[in-house]
């Protein structure tokens, strides 16, 4: 349960950092601050832009330095979806090319939202009423 809440909180911390005029790196830096030493952030996966295609630029790194990367502008849309492992951050992909497992067999949790940079801050477009 703690890992699930950590992953959900990491996603939410990243979203809260997605403000107009900020930088993409602010998102990853907020995730890193939230997770601290309580888990491992899988660097191999990150968020991605949403637009004319499902997966497009920009890449949203979930481990980043604050004030780095592209400037966030109103109208940008992307996902924030950090994968947090209870053990090491190392993962492996099964032969089916889709299933991902932690290399050490530890538990992992991941939550995702699609975010639109609005005039006054992030707007989550994937919330259910």
Where are these regions (language model features)?
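Active-site neighborhoods and metal-handling regions in enzymes and metal-associated proteins
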Residues: 1-129
